């Protein structure tokens, strides 16, 4: 009995240390979540003019989604900033395949089949690329979404290509995607950056 009593203070100290570690880990996890939310909201605030100067380094990971005719459309991308740079014909070269984001290929996932420019696209996950031009852009849906930038891009893996004319838009500092509903079965994937906008129409089957 005396031996057990002797060790009790040490047991209490160890238990207290473990409890403190758990609390610290919980705080750390909560802080990480807070940072993620802040980075996402930051881009929206910059685009709305609520933050005068974009000082965030890097290209935060963002997402866009909508449900069209019970078809969940989900886009994952990274969002670079203008930051006073020349974008078109500068940072983004004309007439070359562009990741239309940063770091990894932008991915678009459809939970149901869709039709794009007369081509049926099976439900699945795909890479979204563009080829910007001075007068027109080519929008591309490609099978290989697991690649860095366009390092492994292969035109033979394209499912569909659509030529569109970009339209002028109010300044958007951080590249942003939207899935805009047109009617019950039709929608468009919209890309805004700097003062240009391009859109890829599709129909949910």
Give the predicted meaning of each segment.
Residues 10, 59-61, 103, 109, ...:
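Short, solvent-exposed coil/turn segments
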Residues 3-10:
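Sec-dependent signal peptide recognition
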Residues 93-147:
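Mid-length scaffold segments of soluble, non-membrane domains
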Residues 20-91, 96, 150-205:
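Primarily secretory-pathway and cell-envelope proteins
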Residues 14-16:
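C-terminal motif of bacterial Sec signal peptides marking the signal peptidase cleavage site
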């Amino acid at each position: 009995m005396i031996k057990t009593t002797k060790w009790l203070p040490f047991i209490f100290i160890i238990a207290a240390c473990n409890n403190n570690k758990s609390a610290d880990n919980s705080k750390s996890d909560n802080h990480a979540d807070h940072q993620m939310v802040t980075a996402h909201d930051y881009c929206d605030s910059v685009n709305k003019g609520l933050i005068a100067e974009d000082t965030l380094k890097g290209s935060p990971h963002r997402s866009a989604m909508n449900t069209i005719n019970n078809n969940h459309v989900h886009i994952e991308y990274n969002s670079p900033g203008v930051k006073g740079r020349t974008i078109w014909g500068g940072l983004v070269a004309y007439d070359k395949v562009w990741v239309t984001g940063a770091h990894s290929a932008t991915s678009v996932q459809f939970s149901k089949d869709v039709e794009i420019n007369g081509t049926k696209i099976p439900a699945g996950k795909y890479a979204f690329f563009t080829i910007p031009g001075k007068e027109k852009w080519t929008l591309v849906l490609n099978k290989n979404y697991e690649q860095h930038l366009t390092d492994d891009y292969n035109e033979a893996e394209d499912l569909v290509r659509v030529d569109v004319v970009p339209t002028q838009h109010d300044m958007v500092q951080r590249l942003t995607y939207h899935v805009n509903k047109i009617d019950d079965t039709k929608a468009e994937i919209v890309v805004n950056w700097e003062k240009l906008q391009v859109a890829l129409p599709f129909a949910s089957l």
